[in-house]
């Protein structure tokens, strides 16, 4: 089910990441945390989902700024390549923002494929960016220019050097 921007989720009985904090409820609306407090009382009709998190810790999403989302490796040959990252791997690791980049393999993997994978993660509701460039000199880009890639492609926020 595709969630709207105003769907509310209530996490009950979780311990915030700060270990000194008592058990709290967390009210989320869309992508925003609205309230963190003990025993939040919201009319049931406004809540899309209630999750009992008793015994669980609520932590912020992690930002991983160096991920080979299209796969990695390859310097040892074709059998040495690592497969592309799956969204479920980000979920399992608690990563909510990712910056993808090419690794040593700028030949069988491309900036175009990297941008496409970044767009796919964004379409799935994650926050994803990527870096243009590769190990090679002159570096690989999508437009033929590092400056143009960064200027005109929204997902590209820098260059791998």
What are these regions (language model features)?
Residues 2-9, 16-59:
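Histidine-rich, glycine-flanked metal-binding segment
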Residues 53-116:
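Metal-associated gating/positioning segment near the N- to mid-region
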Residues 120-161:
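Metal-coordinating catalytic core of metallo-dependent amide/deamination hydrolases
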């Amino acid at each position: 089910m595709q969630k709207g921007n105003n769907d509310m989720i209530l996490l009950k009985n979780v311990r915030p990441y700060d270990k000194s904090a008592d058990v709290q409820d967390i009210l989320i609306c869309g992508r925003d945390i609205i309230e963190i407090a003990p025993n939040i009382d919201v009319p049931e009709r406004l809540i899309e989902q209630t999750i009992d998190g008793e015994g669980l810790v609520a932590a912020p999403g992690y930002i991983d700024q160096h991920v080979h989302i299209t796969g990695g490796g390859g310097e040892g040959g074709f059998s040495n390549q690592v497969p592309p990252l799956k969204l479920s791997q980000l979920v399992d690791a608690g990563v909510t923002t990712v910056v993808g980049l090419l690794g040593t393999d700028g030949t069988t993997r491309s900036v175009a494929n990297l941008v496409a994978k970044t767009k796919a993660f964004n379409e799935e509701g994650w926050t994803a960016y990527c870096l243009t460039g590769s190990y090679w000199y002159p570096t690989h880009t999508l437009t033929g220019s590092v400056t143009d890639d960064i200027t005109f492609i929204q997902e590209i926020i820098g260059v791998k050097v």
